């Protein structure tokens, strides 16, 4: 099961560590990355 693909399908981006400004964490991606979605 590809968490990274699932993240992108929801319009998110995978980041290492924490999400950048104007993004919020919404789950995980592969290899410990986090799925970040844009506010708004």
Curated annotation (Swiss-Prot):
Keywords: Amidation, Antibiotic, Antimicrobial, Defensin, Disulfide bond, Membrane, Secreted. It comes from the Eukaryota. GO terms for biological process: defense response to bacterium. GO terms for molecular function: identical protein binding. It is found in: Secreted; Membrane. The keyword tRNA processing does not apply. Signal peptide: none annotated. The modification Glycine amide is found at residue 40. Disulfide bonds join 7-35, 14-29, 19-36. One of its GO terms (cellular component) is membrane. Belongs to the beta-defensin family. Monomer. Homodimer. Has antimicrobial activity against the Gram-positive bacteria methicillin-resistant S.aureus ATCC 33591 and L.monocytogenes EGD, the Gram-negative bacterium E.coli ML53p and the yeast C.albicans 820. Has no hemolytic activity towards human erythrocytes. This is Beta-defensin 1.
